[in-house]
């Protein structure tokens, strides 16, 4: 029988494998060689460090593992499962960075068809007299298959950001994993993201055409002919999971699941468009990532105590801050498309300060109200604070330069997730 710790590692390795396969397919020539060298070097260093520090801490009695929760395979006295995090970090971080900095797979020259992305739903056009240089008009040539389009639209780099909150909350509440935990994790890993980002890509089509950063890992430009198929695929892949989670869950978890599904639709869908209501846009975006944790906790029948609420509120503040900072880079394009956001209303500089305030508030809530070791997650917020603080002088005119900081978030999210995962594992495997 597979141990609990091993099962958790295998579940959380799914997005790592997905991103690695994506990098292997996407990268070519020197870029692939640099990626392989980066992965190999990071893997060697992290494996050595993990072996050394795990053996030291376990031998010193600082950490102890219940043998019934591990496979029993050890390197020295360190359980083999501990090395999964070294492997995940060594593979995932270089892969994400390589994808962010990769050159377009299809070259473009003046007077030839141009390409809008790095492998997303590729949209091509031939330049015509009088064209607006910032608007890309899609045509059918070069359009990828439907599955490829859906894959990119689901933002595979962000899958773990919604699956991990559910999985960790469920694991923390139950101390284990069963079929409900696995099904829930799979739902929040892929179908949930396809619905969330797919709906967004359909209803943000016009503004995305004007946004040059769309078309890569930061977001796809979804060809109009794929809109109906994307909406249908979103419904078909999510409804069976929703039905299962309602039937196997509690009344409380079902209500939270319904709220989560509504927030996914309401954020982008025509007639609701919460993303165009300043401040509600930040809160709804944050709820997209907090709600899986609430569902994971309540579907296990666990109580939402004061300490749990403190963690969830801090998570909401964290997510709202990240959304507000992310909106800064799109200020000019959103205004041109007559779209409202917390950044277009406040202005770039004020939005950055708003993000900073939310991060600080999250730290305060964790340190003041969250129980140990959950309060230790406050330290995972500090790199975000440092990143955003570098842009406190930004103006609307140069707001797009915050994109560099936003790209760092893609890596910081993984590092923060790693820290939170360690806290949860230590809570269940050690302190309990």
Swiss-Prot record:
Gene3D superfamilies: UbiA prenyltransferase (1.20.120.1780). Keywords: Carotenoid biosynthesis, Cell membrane, Isomerase, Membrane, Transferase, Transmembrane, Transmembrane helix. Pathway: Carotenoid biosynthesis. CDD domains: PT_UbiA_4. It holds the Pfam family UbiA. May form a complex with LbtA. This is C(50) beta-cyclic carotenoids biosynthesis protein LbtBC. The lineage of its organism: Bacteria, Bacillati, Actinomycetota, Actinomycetes, Mycobacteriales. The gene is lbtBC.
């Amino acid at each position: 029988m597979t141990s609990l710790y091993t099962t958790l590692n295998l579940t959380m390795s799914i997005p790592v494998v997905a991103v690695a396969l994506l990098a292997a397919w996407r990268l070519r020539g020197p870029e692939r060689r640099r990626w392989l060298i980066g992965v190999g070097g990071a893997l060697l260093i992290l494996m050595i460090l993990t072996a050394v520090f795990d053996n030291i801490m376990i031998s010193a009695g600082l950490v102890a593992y219940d043998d019934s929760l591990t496979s029993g395979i050890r390197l020295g006295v360190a359980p083999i499962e501990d090395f999964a995090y070294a492997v995940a970090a060594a593979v995932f971080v270089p892969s994400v960075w390589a994808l962010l900095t990769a050159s377009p797979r299809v070259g473009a020259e003046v007077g030839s068809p141009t390409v809008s992305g790095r492998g997303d739903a590729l949209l091509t056009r031939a330049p015509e007299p009088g064209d607006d240089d910032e608007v890309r008009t899609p045509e059918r040539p070069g359009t990828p298959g439907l599955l490829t389009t859906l894959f990119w639209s689901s933002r595979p780099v962000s899958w773990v950001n919604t699956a991990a909150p559910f999985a960790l909350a469920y694991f923390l509440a139950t101390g284990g994993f069963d079929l409900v935990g696995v099904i829930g994790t799979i739902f929040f890993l892929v179908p949930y993201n396809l619905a969330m980002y797919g709906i967004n890509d359909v209803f943000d089509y016009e503004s995305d055409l004007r946004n040059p950063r769309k078309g890569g890992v930061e977001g796809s430009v979804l060809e109009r002919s794929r809109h109906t198929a994307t909406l249908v695929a979103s419904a078909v892949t999510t409804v069976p999971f929703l039905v299962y989670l309602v039937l196997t869950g509690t009344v409380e978890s079902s209500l939270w699941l319904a709220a989560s599904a509504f927030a996914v639709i309401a954020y982008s869908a025509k007639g609701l468009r919460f993303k165009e209501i300043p401040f509600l846009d930040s809160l709804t975006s944050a709820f997209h990532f907090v709600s899986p944790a609430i569902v994971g906790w309540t579907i296990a029948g666990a109580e939402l105590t004061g300490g749990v609420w403190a963690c969830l509120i801090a998570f909401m503040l964290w997510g709202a801050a990240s959304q507000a900072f992310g909106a800064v880079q799109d200020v000019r394009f959103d205004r041109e498309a007559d779209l409202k956001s917390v950044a277009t209303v406040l202005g770039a500089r004020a939005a950055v300060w708003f993000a900073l305030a939310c991060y600080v508030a999250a730290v305060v809530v964790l340190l003041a109200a969250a129980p140990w070791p959950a309060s230790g997650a406050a330290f995972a917020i500090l790199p975000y604070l440092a990143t955003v603080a570098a842009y406190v002088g930004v103006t609307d005119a140069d707001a797009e330069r915050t994109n560099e900081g936003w790209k760092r978030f893609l890596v910081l999210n993984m590092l923060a997730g790693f820290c939170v995962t360690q806290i949860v594992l230590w809570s269940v495997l050690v302190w309990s």
